From Swiss-Prot:
UniProt name for this protein: Protein RADIALIS-like 5
Keyword Transcription (UniProt): yes
Organism lineage string: Eukaryota, Viridiplantae, Streptophyta, Embryophyta, Tracheophyta
Species of provenance: Arabidopsis thaliana
Domain SANT, chain residue ranges per copy: 7-59
CC terms in the record's Gene Ontology section: nucleus
């Protein structure tokens, strides 16, 4: 994926990513000076950096939608496994739960 090509100098923390996502929700494509506003909201990135981050995100999404990204191979897990912290009582409770 494209995001793996990013250098460490342009790495993003989870907090920066969350601020980026929130800013994208506020400043849509029709907002004047969108990337400057998003950069201000993130706080520690330039307009060029947030635009590049957005372009990488769009490319990643397109690759996922086109099935170019393989699904992860998950291990099967025994739900009743004591090592997972679930005992028989918990299993009976979950079995009888009704979500409303």
């Amino acid at each position: 994926m494209a995001s793996s090509s990013m250098s460490s100098s342009s790495s993003w923390t989870s907090k920066q990513n969350k601020m980026f996502e929130r800013a994208l929700a506020v400043y849509d494509k029709d907002t004047p000076d969108r990337w400057q506003n998003v950069a201000k909201a993130v706080g520690s990135k330039s307009a060029e950096e947030v635009k590049r981050h957005y372009d990488i995100l769009v490319e990643d999404l397109m690759n996922i939608e086109q099935d170019l990204v393989p699904l992860p191979k998950y291990k099967t897990v025994d739900v009743g496994s004591k090592s997972r912290g679930i005992d028989d009582f918990d299993l009976r409770l979950m079995k009888n739960m009704r979500i409303q």
